[in-house]
Each structure stands twice: as structure tokens, then as C-alpha cells.
């Protein structure tokens, strides 16, 4: 069959046509493949491998297309139970033996906790049975049969005091499984490992065990700097033959591992727990240089090349000091000196000068000075290259003054050294003393039952009336609308679980926990309501009230929750301009704990009761009863406590109600200053408010503290100073009269920017990059902060997972700045760079030269663990033990009460009664609820039983008007819309649900 060509009379066969199409397609595919391959040869923006573009492209393409990630989650320190293990029987080496036993138990428990199996190399006879590699080298090995098993797919390779004897680490690493080792890695060149002496000669450790054997072995540098290592990959005989053609052209299979170490044993600081986590398996050409940088494990060489017969070892202490241990080979005498001192002494011209300098530095021990002089004597000084054992970094920890903890227990990591020495501390949230002390300091000690005078009550009533405006017949949102607004993944998950139980009354119980965030004092308590039904049903009212009343035109000048950063910045600058910069910053001290039940009843509750239709009043009051008087227990520890009547941070009412209390205090102060003015005029003078943060006119600077005390509150007032900017919502406005540029509160940010609280199974590089990328969005132009973030991204970026991998984690945005998650970023303008820098200098008290030096240091850093910490002159730590002892004002007359509460709560199920407790603080309240559930439907205290009301509300799905499809809008006295000037918000810019705090 033939096909006619459109032009002309020529004809071609179908076969010829198909051949032509195939040829053209094949050529196109070849050209496409060549272009893709050629792209791998691109010139990188950083040092790259040698060779030509073709070899670079070849190596990069093979690595990229063959990389296989290995997912393993393992953190053995979660199973650490004691850092000072003891043995009952003393066999001559009781301490070191107890540490070894504890290490074996820790390893076994941590492997079992993640569902793995153990594959041990030459195990102890007392070790558990299982797969193993057991050769007979020591007499003790004869206690078990010879075995040479193959590790299982879920195996963890374990070695206890055996790694020194392996010929090369690849013997352990080639299986591409985690390796866990308990090893001896000394921080000094001789001395005692607990009760066993050791020396070093010819780079071999001579270790003598009292009541045991003597061992001579080298030491692998597991604890050296560098977090990634490479190894060969073990293959079966079948795989080896199948891969033979690939090996003939120079391809080899390589595995990469991340190496960790810690020194958890207090009595044996020279003992280390080392564990490696496999990361990737790749193929690469062994005859082409690779651009993946890893370190190579090697034996530690203790000999000082510049001083024959001497050993030298550098290490970093827990106090971030670089020390040098020096001593003769094979001798027990050794001394330790700061490296900077030894560097200085090494350059002196005479031994007399060395002695004089040592005495001048306070070293008067003859043995100490003699050892230094003996080390100095002899040859020309050359700076040696010696191994350095780096310490694993630990965040600064907040120790409660009543703590019984032996070691810090925090769920946080540092990804660099602190930027400032007075950095924030992490709370020990796993310790019940931390929870107990936070309850006392943030609830019990600040409980407020003050009842204001008649005059103050009248002012508050006027404020509520003006805040509500014309709205008197609101309807709550429907259940469907509320579910749609509660759009956080965790909320949606909980709502799906209880969707068929929405008609059930919510449970009355608070489960509280310490917030895992850095701070300078006792950690905050999150008082969460575990029953999502309570959150759902209260949110029906809070969301409707916020949408219609609080965001109405008459409140928009002062009510700021729900605005995006640009709207907040514009509003603040407009307010400051209207006041001619005569403004003050207000910040309440522990507003949540100090709000009284009177304020909640007569401001927040009254406002909602008067705004909604009468048929919803009972339901609103019942919810407020629950918030004020609900019983509480510690979620982690189980003990019950009196939560007080203050605001509960996990309630949907927290942010809107706190903002209302804030505004009411200022309205009271304005009334004090202008008693004859019309209330409507004073209401229009209220400044921006959001939670406990606020801005006010300077005319009330003296009266606002008096107004706060009338309600039993404490307030801190700062007058606007152009040199340090204006702070609102933790953002500093550098010059609100001229620009909307803001920066993150610099001192607060610098104190905590080096910390991450992400899950420890997430690689540190990933957590660091995720965290600083958020700050680079909100503070891309902020001096010092942006420079630090760029440094972290530059140094951690190459080792971090791909953006696709990081985006798949649900916790990706956990540590992003709050405002980045609210559909907006704060405005910053390049022309304000100098202003931002000057404000930062004033607020941090770091002079300009030091700021410039830090910025230069960040730009030049090649290792994230280089020392960058700026020494702060003062410490802001409170209620804790700091590095110098008890922090100022941390121990006072409250200490006996703290200790008493701690001892009482040590037994879960008991709680200390409080005389000022709420109405529902009976000691048997929780058990009573259990009895109620056993007898029939669960009923909240003080609420009418199900079915006793008119059936229109009472917390269940309501019929009629509440099941509508839209948000109601209030009507004015004449039937017209009262909010005609307010345009509907744009898509994606709606006021955010206020069920959580900022």
C-alpha cells in the first residue's frame, strides 16, 4: 500500500515512513540524553573536582542516578537511665565494669525500643544469644562457640570494647546497618579510666585492669571532627559476579554513614558511646575524583612530631575551653593546660621566661611548672598537627531550684555554638519538678481574686458596651463551618475521629504540659483541652464573635489579632504618626495566670452573652464555667493540681479574651486621665492590642499601672525611644514615623537562634536549614541575624536532605517564625539597613565593631562548630542555677512552698489543696467523673443534664437558625447593615482563627 505525498507525485512505502519517523525520534532522544548528561558537567559555585567536564559529568550523573537513601531512626540516649552506674561487688574494677555493664544494657534497650535485632562482635559470655561474629582471640572468647553469622536486615552491629582490634572500620560498616560501640577514647595522654590506669606508647594504649587483664591496642578516631564517613558495601557472591562488568570499568559501590558520639558516664569521661547511622548507598567511578566530602577514619597518633618522646592530645571541655594534655610516652605523669597559654609559652626564648609566665598566670605547683618546662626544652617550636577530640554539644539547661535531676534532660539540640553567652535555656520537660515549679510560679503564686471597686466595674461595663456596639442578636457558626475553620492537620485528625460523637457533651478536663521552648525563666504551661469537642463548640462562638464584632469598623483601630504583618505594620505606623511618636509599649506580666474570674465573667462572658441571642446564653455561660473552674492534671506525670481561675492557654478564647482585657485596662487608664470626656471618644483613643502586647498613648504612662492594679494585674511600661525602636509583637519598628521596616527582637532572637527542638531523628542539618530558612524570609535584611542564618545554610546545606524530602515532613514548619505561617512576611526595605543595624546595636549592647567582627566571622566560617560566642556582660537567667551558681533572686521565701509542692506532687494522684481554688477544685472531682461515666452519659459539673433545656443549644448540634450556611451579620436599629464600610476580606487573607495563641 502506498501513500501519496501532498506535494508532487512521488510515493513512499509505509515501511519507509516508519523508518524515517523512528530515525528522527531516535536522534531526538539521543540529543536530549546528551543535553541532560552535559548539564551534569556544569561549573559549580564552589570548589569542584579536577579533570575535564566530561569526567565530572560522568561521575555526577552516576552518583545522582544511583543514590539510594537508607531510612533508620535510632537515638540510643533515649534509653539512658543512669550516668553513675554502680556495682554491688568490688572486683577490682567495679566502676569501669559497672559502666561497661550499663553501656551494654543501654545498647540492648535502645535497639529493642526501635524493633531491631542485635548482631554483636565477640560478645561477652553474659550477653544475650543471637546472631554474632565470634572468633577466638582471647582466652575468655573460648566460653562461646566459633560463629561467623550474617547480620539480619534489621540488625544493629554492636561492639563493646572490641573496635580497637578490627583491621579496618569497613568490617563493621560494610553491612550498611547502624553500628553501636562502647569504646575507650581518652581525653588525656595518661591517667586513670575510673579505677584502671593507662598510658600511651608508640601510639598504643597500654590499659591495665585491676583484677583483670592488660590490654595494648590503638584507638580509632571516632570522636574526631567530621560527621560523615564512607565505607565499602558488602555484596553476596551472586551480586559480585553480576556486578563484575561494572567493576571492570571502574565502578564501585560506596556507602555513607553519619557518625555520632557522646560521653554519658560521669565516672568514666574517657569512655564514649559511638553510633553510626547509614545514610546513602551510591555507585561511583574509582578513577574519577568525587566531590562528596567525607572524612576517613584513622588510628589516632598521640606522638608529638615536634617533641620526640612526648604525647600530645587536644580536647574541648564542657565549658568550651580548648585544652592540651601533654606527657611523656609510657609515663603516668601528664598535665593539662589551656591551648592558648601553651601557644604563648611555646614562643618564648628562655625557660626562665616560661617559669615566670606560669607563676604570673597563677600556676605555682612545682610538678605543673616542671612538666611545662620539660616539654618546652629542646627544639625549635613548630605548631604541631595533633588529634582533637571534640565534645558533643549540649544546649544550656534551665535547672529549677528544687530540681533533683543528676544530669540535664532536654529535648533540644544545638546546630552551632551560642551566638551570645547569655543564651536561652531549655526546660527539662521530662522532669516532674519542672512541671511542679512552673505551676507554682505561673499559677499559684500569681493567682488573683481581686474584685474591683464600683467605679472600675462601671468603666468595664461601659467598655463592653462600646466594644459590642449595635450587635445583640448574633448566631454562632454552624458545626460544619467551624470544622472548616479549624483547619490545622492535628485538629482535622481529631475531628474526624469524633465526627459521629458531636452530639455528646464535652469532657471537663485540662491536660497541661510544659512548652518545649527556650527561655530565661520557668517554662510556660500549655493548658490544653484534650476533648476536641470542647474546642469545636467553643470555637462556634469565638469565631463568630471575632468575625462580626471584634473585626467590625468600630473596633478595627485597636483589635489586631487576625491581621497579617503588612496590615499590622501599617496600623502601628499610622498610630505612632497620629500620636506624634508620644507612645508607650505595654506588656503584662503573666497575664494568663493573673486574670481574675471577675474579669472573665464581667468582660469576656458579658460581652458574648450580650452579643448573641438569648437562647445561647446558657451554653456560653457553661463554657465559661468550664474554662474558669475546670480541673486539671499534668499530662506527662498524672498528678492533679488546682489550675486557678486564670486564662487557659489551650482554650480558643485565649487570644481574643486577653486582647479584650488589655483594651479594658487602657480604657480604664484613659478614663482616669480624662474623667469628663465622653466614653465614645475615649474608646477611639485605645491603641493597638494583640494578646498581652499593646501600644498606648504616652498621656496615660502614669495612670495605666494604676488601672492595671485595680484589676489585680501587673504591667511593664516602656516609653518609645527612637534610638532603640518600638517593639510590638516581638517585632521592632526601627522608625515608625518614616518606614514600616521591622526586625525581629534582636537580643531575644540571638539568644535562641542556635537551638532546635525538632525530633532528634530528623538530621541536624535538615532541622537547622528548615529553621534558618524561615528567618531568612522574615528577616532577610536584618543585620547579624540574616548573616548567621546564611552561614548556617551555607555550611549545613550540602549535607542536608533535598528540599523535597524536607517538605514531606509534617513538622517542616514547626520552628518557622509565627508570622511566616500566617500568609505574610514583615516589610523590610533595603534603604533602612543602617537604621536596622543601629537599633540592633542599641538593643543588644554589642558595639558596632563587635557586630562587624561577628558578621565577618560568619562569612569566613568553614566549620559550624567554630567558636562564635559573644560574651555577655550580664545574665538574665531567673529561677535557676546558672554556670556561676544560683541566679540572682532565684531563692527567696517561696523556696519552702516550692519544695512542699514538689514533694506532694511526687506521688501521682495527690494534689495540694489551695484555699483560693475555684469552685470545682474538690479533691475527688476526677474520680467522680469516672463514676458518672460508669452510671450514664458523662455530664460536666454545673451544667444541666442532656435533654433538660429547650433543645436548641446546650453544646450539641443545634437546630434551626444555627445550622445556617453563612456567618450572620448584625442589623442596625433601622434594619440597615451596621458594618457597611468593612469590605469582605480577600481570599487567603481572612482573619485567622484565634483558637491558639500567638
From Swiss-Prot:
The lineage of its organism: Viruses, Riboviria, Orthornavirae, Kitrinoviricota, Magsaviricetes. Drastically inhibited by phosphonoacetic acid. Only slightly inhibited by gliotoxin. This is RNA-directed RNA polymerase. It comes from Flock house virus. Residues 35-998 are annotated as: Cytoplasmic. Its cofactor is Mn(2+). InterPro entries: DNA/RNA_pol_sf, Noda_Vmethyltr_dom. Optimum pH is 8.0. It comes from the Viruses. Residues 1-67, 233-250 are annotated as: Interaction with host mitochondria outer membrane. Changing residue 215 to A: Reduced RNA replication. Residues 91-282 are annotated as: Capping. One of its GO terms (cellular component) is membrane. Signal peptide: none annotated. Residues 1-400, 700-800 are annotated as: Homomultimerization. The viral bipartite genome is composed of RNA1 and RNA2. Residues 971-984 have a biased composition (Basic residues). It is a single-pass membrane protein. The chain crosses the membrane at residues 17-34.
Amino acid at each position: 500500500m502506498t501513500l501519496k505525498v501532498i506535494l508532487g507525485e512521488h510515493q513512499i512505502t509505509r515501511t519507509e515512513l516508519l523508518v524515517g519517523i523512528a530515525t528522527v525520534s531516535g536522534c531526538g532522544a539521543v540529543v536530549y540524553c546528551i543535553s541532560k548528561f552535559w548539564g551534569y558537567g556544569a561549573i559549580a559555585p564552589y570548589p569542584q573536582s579536577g579533570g575535564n567536564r566530561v569526567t565530572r559529568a560522568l561521575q555526577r550523573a552516576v552518583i545522582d542516578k544511583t543514590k539510594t537513601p537508607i531510612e533508620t531512626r535510632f537515638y540510643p540516649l533515649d534509653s539512658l537511665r543512669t550516668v553513675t552506674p554502680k556495682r554491688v561487688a568490688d572486683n577490682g574494677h567495679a566502676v569501669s565494669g559497672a559502666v561497661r555493664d550499663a553501656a551494654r544494657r543501654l545498647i540492648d534497650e535502645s535497639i529493642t525500643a526501635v524493633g531491631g535485632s542485635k548482631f554483636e562482635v565477640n560478645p561477652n559470655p553474659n550477653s544475650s544469644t543471637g546472631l554474632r561474629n565470634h572468633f577466638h582471640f582471647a582466652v575468655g572468647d573460648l566460653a562461646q562457640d566459633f560463629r561467623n553469622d550474617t547480620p539480619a536486615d534489621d540488625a544493629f552491629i554492636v561492639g563493646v570494647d572490641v573496635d580497637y582490634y578490627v583491621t579496618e572500620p569497613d568490617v563493621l560498616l560494610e553491612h550498611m546497618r547502624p553500628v553501636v560501640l562502647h569504646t575507650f577514647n581518652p581525653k588525656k595522654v595518661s591517667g586513670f579510666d575510673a579505677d584502671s590506669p593507662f598510658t600511651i606508647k608508640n601510639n598504643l594504649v597500654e590499659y591495665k585492669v585491676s583484677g583483670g587483664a592488660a590490654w595494648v591496642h590503638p584507638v580509632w578516631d571516632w570522636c574526631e571532627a567530621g560527621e560523615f564517613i564512607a565505607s565499602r558495601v558488602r555484596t553476596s557472591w551472586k551480586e559480585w559476579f553480576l556486578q563484575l562488568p561494572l567493576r571492570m570499568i571502574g565502578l564501585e559501590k560506596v556507602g555513607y554513614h553519619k557518625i555520632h558520639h557522646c560521653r554519658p558516664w560521669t565516672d568514666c569521661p574517657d569512655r564514649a558511646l559511638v553510633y553510626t547511622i547509614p545514610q546513602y548507598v551510591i555507585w561511583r567511578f574509582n578513577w574519577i575524583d568525587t566531590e562528596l566530602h567525607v572524612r576517613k577514619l584513622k588510628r589516632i597518633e598521640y606522638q608529638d612530631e615536634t617533641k620526640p618522646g612526648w604525647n600530645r592530645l587536644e580536647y574541648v571541655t564542657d565549658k568550651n575551653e580548648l585544652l592540651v594534655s601533654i606527657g611523656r610516652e609510657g609515663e603516668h605523669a601528664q598535665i593539662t593546660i589551656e591551648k592558648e597559654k601553651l601557644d604563648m609559652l611555646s614562643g618564648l626564648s628562655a625557660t626562665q621566661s616560661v617559669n615566670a609566665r606560669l607563676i604570673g598566670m597563677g600556676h605555682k605547683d612545682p610538678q605543673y611548672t616542671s612538666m611545662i618546662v620539660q616539654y618546652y626544652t629542646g627544639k625549635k617550636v613548630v605548631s604541631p598537627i595533633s588529634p582533637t577530640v571534640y565534645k558533643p554539644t549540649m544546649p544550656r539547661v534551665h535547672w529549677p531550684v528544687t530540681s533533683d535531676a543528676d544530669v540535664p534532660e532536654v529535648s533540644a539540640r544545638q546546630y552551632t555554638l551560642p551566638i551570645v553567652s547569655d543564651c536561652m535555656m531549655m526546660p527539662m520537660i521530662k522532669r516532674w519538678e519542672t512541671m511542679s515549679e512552673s505551676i507554682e510560679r505561673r499559677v499559684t503564686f500569681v493567682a488573683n481574686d481581686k474584685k474591683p471597686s464600683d467605679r472600675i466595674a462601671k468603666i468595664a461595663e461601659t467598655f463592653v458596651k462600646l466594644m459590642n456596639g449595635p450587635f445583640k442578636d448574633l448566631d454562632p457558626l454552624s458545626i460544619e463551618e467551624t470544622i472548616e475553620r479549624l483547619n490545622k492537620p492535628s485538629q482535622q485528625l481529631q475531628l474526624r475521629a469524633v465526627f459521629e460523637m458531636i452530639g455528646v457533651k464535652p469532657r471537663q478536663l485540662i491536660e497541661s504540659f510544659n512548652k518545649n521552648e527556650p527561655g530565661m525563666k520557668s517554662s510556660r504551661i500549655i493548658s490544653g483541652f484534650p476533648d476536641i469537642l470542647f474546642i469545636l463548640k467553643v470555637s462556634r462562638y469565638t469565631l463568630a464573635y471575632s468575625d462580626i464584632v471584634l473585626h467590625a469598623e468600630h473596633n478595627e483601630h485597636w483589635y489586631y489579632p487576625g491581621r497579617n504583618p503588612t496590615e499590622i505594620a501599617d496600623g502601628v505606623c499610622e498610630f505612632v504618626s497620629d500620636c506624634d511618636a508620644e507612645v508607650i509599649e505595654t506588656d503584662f506580666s503573666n497575664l494568663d495566670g493573673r486574670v481574675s474570674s471577675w474579669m472573665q465573667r464581667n468582660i469576656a462572658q458579658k460581652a458574648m452573652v450580650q452579643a448573641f441571642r438569648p437562647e445561647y446564653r446558657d451554653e456560653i455561660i457553661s463554657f465559661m464555667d468550664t474554662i474558669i473552674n475546670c480541673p486539671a492534671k499534668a499530662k506527662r506525670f498524672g498528678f492533679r493540681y488546682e489550675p486557678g481561675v486564670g486564662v487557659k492557654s489551650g482554650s480558643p478564647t485565649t487570644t481574643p479574651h486577653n486582647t479584650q482585657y488589655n483594651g479594658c485596662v487602657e480604657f480604664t487608664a484613659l478614663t482616669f486621665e480624662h474623667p469628663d470626656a465622653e466614653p465614645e471618644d475615649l474608646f477611639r483613643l485605645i491603641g493597638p492590642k494583640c494578646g498581652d502586647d499593646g501600644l498606648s498613648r504616652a498621656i496615660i504612662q502614669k495612670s495605666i499601672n494604676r488601672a492595671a492594679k485595680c484589676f489585680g494585674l501587673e504591667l511593664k511600661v516602656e516609653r518609645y525611644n527612637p534610638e532603640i525602636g518600638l517593639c510590638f509583637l516581638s517585632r521592632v519598628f526601627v522608625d515608625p514615623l518614616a518606614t514600616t521596616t521591622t526586625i525581629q527582637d534582636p537580643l531575644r532572637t540571638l539568644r535562641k537562634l542556635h537551638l532546635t527542638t525538632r525530633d532528634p531523628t530528623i538530621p541536624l542539618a535538615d532541622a537547622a536549614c528548615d529553621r534558618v530558612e524561615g528567618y531568612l524570609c522574615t528577616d532577610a535584611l536584618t543585620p547579624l541575624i540574616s548573616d548567621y542564618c546564611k552561614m548556617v545554610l551555607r555550611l549545613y546545606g550540602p549535607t542536608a536532605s533535598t528540599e523535597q524530602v524536607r517538605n514531606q515532613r509534617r513538622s517542616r514548619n514547626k520552628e518557622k517564625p509565627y508570622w511566616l505561617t500566617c500568609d505574610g512576611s514583615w516589610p523590610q526595605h533595603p534603604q533602612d539597613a543602617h537604621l536596622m543595624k543601629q537599633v540592633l546595636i542599641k538593643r543588644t549592647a554589642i558595639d558596632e565593631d563587635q557586630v562587624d567582627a561577628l558578621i565577618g566571622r560568619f562569612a569566613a566560617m568553614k566549620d559550624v562548630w567554630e567558636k562564635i560566642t559573644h560574651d555577655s556582660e550580664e545574665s538574665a537567667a531567673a529561677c535557676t542555677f546558672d554556670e556561676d551558681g544560683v541566679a540572682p533572686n532565684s531563692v527567696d521565701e517561696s523556696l519552702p512552698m516550692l519544695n512542699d509542692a514538689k514533694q506532694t506532687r511526687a506521688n501521682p494522684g495527690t494534689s495540694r489543696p489551695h484555699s483560693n481554688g475555684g469552685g470545682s477544685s474538690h479533691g475527688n472531682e476526677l474520680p467522680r467523673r469516672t463514676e458518672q461515666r460508669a452510671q450514664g452519659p458523662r455530664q460536666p459539673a454545673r451544667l444541666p443534664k442532656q435533654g433538660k433545656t429547650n433543645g436548641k443549644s446546650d453544646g450539641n448540634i443545634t437546630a434551626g437558625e444555627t445550622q445556617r450556611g453563612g456567618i450572620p451579620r448584625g442589623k442596625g436599629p433601622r434594619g440597615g447593615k451596621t458594618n457597611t464600610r468593612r469590605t469582605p476580606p480577600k481570599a487567603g487573607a481572612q482573619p485567622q482563627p484565634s483558637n491558639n495563641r500567638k
